[in-house]
């Protein structure tokens, strides 16, 4: 493993470019070179950068997809550089290549699913967003579940703990959605559905947490004047 130095960072950038340049148009090689250099310099622990190289070797389709993502999406490159560990974790999770809500090419299928849910008294539209809601609920429960705060502290706790947690989760899932969209791993219906359900789940789970803390302080409203 190369030592952690400026030269090693340059070596990492060169190795990344060698893996990715074959998938980039000639007129965009300079942009890809800049992206590889930026990522390598962002790796405070260069071991993480070489971990990415290992994944590129192990997963044949990953290099072409990463090349496109770094060239087209500044958002993705920013976040991959900002938190390399989180990016590697996202790759390892398999979620980049997994559809949460598989859809066919029928334009009316998502609408039909929603209509079916809404017309069935035993069903709820929430079931359709259960993947995001379950993931986010588990994350909130793990990181905030043991905390008890009074009403006067809710604002501070939301600012201090809940909002960063929601932001982190939302950014992870946005990286996944962008990756799948740019690489045509999802169609337009799935992409727009993912965006809608992600937004709705973040709002719903945030309200659930705040409601629980408020109810603990004031009690649960049960009528028009209570």
Please annotate each region the language model reported.
Residues 1-226:
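Non-catalytic regulatory/linker segments of enzymes
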């Amino acid at each position: 493993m190369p030592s952690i130095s400026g030269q090693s960072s340059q070596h990492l950038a060169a190795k990344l470019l060698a893996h990715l340049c074959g998938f980039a148009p000639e007129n965009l090689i300079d942009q890809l070179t800049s992206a590889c250099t930026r990522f390598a310099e962002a790796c405070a622990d260069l071991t993480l950068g070489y971990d990415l190289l290992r994944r590129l070797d192990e997963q044949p389709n990953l290099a072409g997809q990463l090349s496109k993502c770094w060239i087209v999406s500044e958002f993705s490159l920013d976040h991959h550089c900002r938190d390399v560990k989180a990016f590697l974790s996202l790759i390892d999770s398999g979620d980049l290549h997994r559809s949460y809500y598989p859809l066919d090419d029928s334009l009316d299928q998502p609408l039909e699913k929603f209509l079916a849910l809404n017309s069935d008294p035993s069903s709820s539209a929430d079931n359709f967003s259960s993947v995001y809601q379950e993931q986010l609920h588990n994350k909130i429960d793990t990181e905030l579940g043991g905390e008890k705060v009074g009403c006067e502290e809710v604002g501070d706790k939301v600012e201090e703990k809940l909002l960063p947690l929601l932001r982190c989760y939302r950014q992870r899932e946005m990286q996944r959605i962008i990756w799948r969209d740019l690489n045509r791993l999802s169609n337009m219906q799935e992409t727009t559905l993912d965006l809608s359900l992600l937004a709705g789940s973040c709002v719903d789970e945030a309200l659930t947490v705040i409601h629980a803390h408020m109810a603990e302080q004031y009690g649960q409203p049960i009528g028009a004047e209570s």
